[in-house]
Amino acid sequence: MNDHELYMRRAIALAANVPDLPFGALIVDGDSGTILSEGWNKTSVNPTWHGEIDAINGLASSGVLVEGKNLVLYTTAEPCPMCQAAALWSGIKMVVFGTSIRSLQRSGWRQIDILAEEVVRCSPAWNCKLIGGVLERDCDALFQKAMFHRVSSSDLISLVSSGGSVE
């Protein structure tokens, strides 16, 4: 197992905090390997509080000096445009993700159709390397299971609220 897989396994574990929205993220000092911050989806509190934003906010409030650090963001899914832009503004030099936006879309997840690669390309003032597909099958399985559960739960709620029976 390489370092990217090790940290992605941690992101997958963090995603378990919200199994219906399994977006887990962590920020690592790429030189020392120290985990600086962790996060997961908290959109039930704030619609912009994605896993990546949670990790970035945690790092910002930690008091850790990040200027000049080789920051790496690990996340179970390719960052949406908001999260990728936040990573750039935060000085993150590398983003490593599992599931792609395209894969999420194929599984039924609503996504803004702008890839992280395009956000980076349109932001020449920053350098940020993207590495996708790390433990992709494991991450894809997380999102497929969550989507199945979300669809099954909403069907059940609709059935019960319309007077149907679950017997």
Model-derived features with residue positions:
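Glycine-rich phosphate-binding loop at the start of an alpha helix
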Residues: 5, 49, 53, 77, ...
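Helix-adjacent hinge/juxtasegments
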Residues: 57-94
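Short beta-strand scaffold segments in enzyme catalytic cores
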Residues: 23-33
